[in-house]
């Protein structure tokens, strides 16, 4: 019995150490992100971006939109994208072998006509059937290809994109009008920048008209509200914090921007990959930054892209399981980076953080809950210790989430009404009772499925934006 | 920037009422927020009475105070402080080229003469680049010769590209010979920019060099070569068409076919 007691105590001590370690990392990230945000806001405050782009030597950008069975939203989405503010951009829509009327809709609405084409680059992709150009919108081209998945479609788009910068967006993303001006700035300021990500926000509950956010709101669903807080925490603190170390390991696939040369050098996206958005960034660190450590993969905290969050448990579960599989896949594919001093901060700190806390986190947490219950049931920990530990853990989670909401309020103030702020505060508090544990469980299951061979994407249903 | 009736009304409202002393008192306060707001409105209304206080604020340790004061002085067209703004900007890590450009472009075109005198001895590539961009912005012709010398010798890509754009904007034909050398630059962005410029500044003597660039390794360069040839050489469209459809396996010809087919849709 004494040996079991030691084992249980030992494991509990390990969990406590793990908990303290992750708390310390989050606190450091919070402080770093806070100062970065202040600095960023000061920088951007005196800039009239439209004027800057009139004056300076900007780079042209190609925006790649992979589309698979998007007949319902593609027309509205493209009309909105064509209104983006940027002096020289090309919109490349890749119809990835849709089985619905996506291509037909493009014919009907954009006066596209077939053009002669030759790929400028040779990234691997499924066969391109035809390329079309719009006579109405000269900056719109449509690529029709055999189905090969998102990564494959993006590669086909890159092969035909004309501009030195490539933005990749989801067909159902809602972009802010000036998002390209903002995301391109880091490339103009520093020629070592090879990739830039921006903040993704949840659009549920907002008023969207013709593909533009006209009034930011909050969904009535608490599930969506929890995700708003989650996104604020992930983007405002997580990515901002890691950015200071040049340690961004993931840029959201909903909206990312790259130097085309960098994409070509690493042979583009990896077809068939589950988490292609993370995998490509890790590969950039591994291949390009090893050759030239000055290269930067960076992040701008501006809310530039809005996306629809799942409002049902079924879809959310599928999404989280897929994300976890993507994380595991990317980390295992590039395990060479783990504690490898040749990769600097990435190898010694950021990658181990992702492996230990993002990949293994759900496993440790689930076992932690399990052992905690066992310890308590068998009297290895006292009631007062159990209550103190749980209260600290939950309070800490609440503080982190509330800080994210406060930082949002101090910086971008996209939720200006007091009622919205109070709702977000409530969500920041409530998400710690059930929601967080549920997502941990789904991530655990995602990992389990990954290792038992179920590595498919799963279904991702979206309601779509009504207007 | 306010102009016309809007400017007159705001200027009268601030300069001829008690708002001006109120804003100046805020400018003298210790709060960066109050200073920034006051500087913004005094600059917009071109309140000369604030000039001396704003000049002192350029030495502020607070970056936002420095930037708002510099912007206000630029709107007041206080050309004497141009180089003080450049010098002080270096104290702050995050005062970018963009911020400086936006501030400098608020001055009137009179700034160009001062910048031209400085450019003759300026070695800093960032200031050279900003200066040339401003010459382009104001379409300032007298700087052509000096910028030409810089463009030929500069090792800085930004400076070279800004120079080429400047030559194009003022149609500085003397730059054509310099472009002859730059068309083979190892930097693709420069080659692409030269080809664009040749559409305005070049002549038929460039024809062979432009044809050579159709076999460039970079798409932008190839694309610009085709479009420049069509603009620059009368009757070249037919020759280009023959090239495009007579060499079906040639990569350069494939790109030309694409450009031609795009052009037919656009037209």
PLM region spans:
Chain B
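N-terminal cationic amphipathic segment used for targeting or macromolecule association
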Residues: 229, 242, 246-250
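Structural detector for internal amphipathic alpha-helices that build alpha-solenoid repeat scaffolds
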Residues: 4-14, 36-45, 67-78, 87, ...
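Short inter-helical turns and helix N-cap capping residues of alpha-solenoid HEAT/ARM repeat scaffolds
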Residues: 30-31, 61-65, 92-96, 123-124, ...
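Extended hydrophobic secondary-structure segments
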Residues: 213, 221-222
């Amino acid at each position: 019995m004494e040996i079991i007691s030691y084992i249980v105590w030992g494991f509990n001590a390990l969990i406590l150490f793990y908990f303290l370690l992750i708390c310390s990392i989050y606190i450091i990230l919070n402080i770093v992100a806070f100062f970065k945000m202040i600095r960023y806001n000061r920088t951007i405050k005196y800039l009239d971006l439209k004027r800057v782009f009139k004056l300076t030597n900007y780079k042209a950008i190609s925006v790649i939109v992979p589309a698979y069975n998007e007949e319902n939203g593609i027309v509205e989405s493209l009309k909105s994208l064509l209104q983006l503010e940027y002096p020289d951009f090309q919109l490349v829509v890749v119809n990835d072998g849709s089985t619905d009327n996506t291509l037909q809709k493009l014919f009907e609405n954009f006066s596209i006509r077939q053009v002669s084409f030759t790929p400028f680059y040779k990234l691997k992709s499924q066969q391109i059937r035809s390329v079309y150009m719009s006579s109405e919108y000269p900056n719109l081209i449509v690529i029709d290809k055999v189905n090969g998945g998102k990564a494959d479609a993006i590669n086909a788009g890159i092969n035909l994109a004309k501009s030195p910068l490539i933005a990749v967006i989801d067909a159902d993303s809602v972009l802010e009008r000036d998002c390209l001006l903002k995301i391109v700035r880091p490339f103009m300021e520093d020629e070592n920048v090879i990739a830039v990500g921006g903040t993704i926000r949840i659009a549920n509950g907002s008023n969207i008209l013709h593909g533009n956010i006209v009034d930011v709101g909050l969904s009535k669903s608490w599930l969506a509200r929890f995700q708003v807080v989650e996104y604020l925490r992930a983007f405002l603190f997580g990515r901002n914090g890691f950015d200071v170390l040049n340690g961004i390991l993931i840029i959201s696939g909903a909206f990312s921007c790259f130097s085309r040369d960098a994409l070509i050098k690493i042979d583009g996206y990896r077809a068939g990959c589950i988490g292609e958005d993370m995998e490509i960034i890790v590969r950039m660190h591994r291949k390009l930054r090893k050759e030239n450590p000055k290269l930067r993969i960076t992040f701008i905290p501006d809310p530039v892209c809005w996306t629809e969050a799942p409002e049902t448990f079924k879809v959310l579960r599928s999404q989280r399981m897929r994300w976890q599989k993507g994380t595991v896949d990317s980390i295992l594919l590039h395990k060479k980076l783990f504690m490898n001093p040749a990769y600097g901060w990435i190898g010694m700190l950021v990658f181990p953080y992702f492996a230990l806390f993002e990949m293994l986190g759900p496993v440790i947490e689930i076992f932690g809950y399990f052992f905690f219950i066992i310890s308590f049931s068998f009297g290895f920990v006292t009631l007062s210790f159990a209550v103190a530990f749980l209260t600290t853990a939950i309070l800490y989670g609440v503080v982190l989430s509330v800080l994210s909401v406060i930082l949002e309020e101090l910086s971008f103030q996209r939720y200006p009404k007091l009622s919205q702020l109070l709702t977000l505060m409530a969500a920041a508090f409530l998400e710690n009772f059930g929601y967080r544990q549920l997502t941990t469980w789904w991530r655990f299951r995602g990992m389990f499925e990954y290792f038992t061979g179920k590595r498919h994407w799963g279904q991702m249903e979206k309601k779509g934006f009504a207007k | 920037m306010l102009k016309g009736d809007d400017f007159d009304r705001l200027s009268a409202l601030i300069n001829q009422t008690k708002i001006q002393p109120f804003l100046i008192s805020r400018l003298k306060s210790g709060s960066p927020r109050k200073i920034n707001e006051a500087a913004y409105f005094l600059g917009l209304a071109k309140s000369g009475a604030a000039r001396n206080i704003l000049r002192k604020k350029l030495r502020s340790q607070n970056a936002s105070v420095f930037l708002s004061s510099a912007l206000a002085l630029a709107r007041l067209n206080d050309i004497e402080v141009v180089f003080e703004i450049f010098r002080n900007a270096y104290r702050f890590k995050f005062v970018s080229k963009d911020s400086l450009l936006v501030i400098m472009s608020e001055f009137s075109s009179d700034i160009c003469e001062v910048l031209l005198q400085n450019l003759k001895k300026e070695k800093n590539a960032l200031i050279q680049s900003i200066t040339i961009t401003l010459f382009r912005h104001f379409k300032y012709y007298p700087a052509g010769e000096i910028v030409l010398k810089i463009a030929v010798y500069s090792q800085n890509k930004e400076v070279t590209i800004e120079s080429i754009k400047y030559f194009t904007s003022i149609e500085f034909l003397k730059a054509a010979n310099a472009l002859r050398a730059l068309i083979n630059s190892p930097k693709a962005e420069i080659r692409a920019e030269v080809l664009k410029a040749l559409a305005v500044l070049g002549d038929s003597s460039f024809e062979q060099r432009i044809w050579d660039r159709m076999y460039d390794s970079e798409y932008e360069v190839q694309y610009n070569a085709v479009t420049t040839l069509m603009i620059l050489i009368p009757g070249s469209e037919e020759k280009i068409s023959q090239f495009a459809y007579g060499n079906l396996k040639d990569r350069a010809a494939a790109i030309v076919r694409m450009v031609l087919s795009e052009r037919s849709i656009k037209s």
